[in-house]
């Protein structure tokens, strides 16, 4: 999987040590991608509804976007009937939010809702191989 992710000049960074590298890339106007459908850490991330159930969700994309005025864009590929994949991008608006706990939670809700809408539109194309709801909300 990492070979596939890095074959077009991408770099994969370890999540535990990524903060400095991610901030540096954002400040250099380089794109940064997060796998936002993965479960977060229940001790440092936040719970928001995903597919009707509370799920611990990474807050870092919202925190970085609000702190650095970097856009959040959901990207996904859909297989068309002819077997060709179409890549689609959807920007998540957040001009009305500030970098507060409430603002970060609201932006996280928005990007999770956008992901959920994509999955509901193309459920047969969602490749899901992990426990998204492995932690109970407090």
Residues of each region from the PLM?
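Membrane-interfacial amphipathic helices and adjacent loop/beta segments
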Residues: 1-16
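Non-catalytic C-terminal accessory region of glycerolipid acyltransferases
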Residues: 16-138
């Amino acid at each position: 999987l990492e070979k596939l992710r890095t074959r077009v000049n991408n770099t994969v960074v370890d999540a535990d040590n990524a903060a400095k590298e991610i901030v540096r890339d954002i400040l250099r106007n380089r794109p940064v991608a997060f796998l936002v459908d993965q479960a977060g850490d229940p001790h440092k991330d936040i719970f928001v509804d995903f597919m009707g159930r509370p799920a611990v969700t990474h807050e870092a994309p919202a925190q970085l976007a609000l702190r650095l005025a970097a856009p959040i864009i959901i990207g996904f590929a859909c297989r068309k009937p002819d077997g060709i994949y179409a890549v689609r991008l959807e920007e998540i608006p957040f001009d009305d939010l500030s970098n507060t706990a409430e603002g970060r939670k609201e932006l996280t809700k928005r990007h999770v809702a956008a992901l959920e809408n994509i999955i509901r539109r193309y459920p047969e194309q969602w490749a899901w191989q992990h426990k998204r709801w492995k932690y109970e909300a407090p």
